Amino acid sequence: MRISFEEMAIKVADVVKDRSEDPYKKVGVCVLNKEGRILSVGYNGLLSKQQISNDFWEDRDERRKYIIHAETNALACITRYDEPYILASTLLPCANCAINICSHGIKHVYYTEEYHKDQLAYEIFDFYKVSLKKLNI
């Protein structure tokens, strides 16, 4: 049976998350246009070529200050002219990422896991009329 574009995007995001160096929480994102073509992928991590010591990852609160979210990394690679339509994430986006997602004109967000239920993220998606759906894949 042929899988849907949403399922494909989630599976791509699940593979992409393995690029993250974060040993505690790996997140992957895949952005599609209306035709189901992949526009961008992203994962949570530091800026490219950032040199860090191995003990950087041990202090959760310290590392969280510097990590760039997967959604931000994926959206940084596209423009509104690309007409992003669907964002699939392995984790429910936080409120800050929700605003960023909405500002890019994305209409549908799919995710597979809730790390922390972020009520504000739900409210933001609802306010901007972006559909949000948890997929069980």
Language-model regions, residue ranges each:
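Zinc-dependent deaminase catalytic domain
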Residues: M1-I137
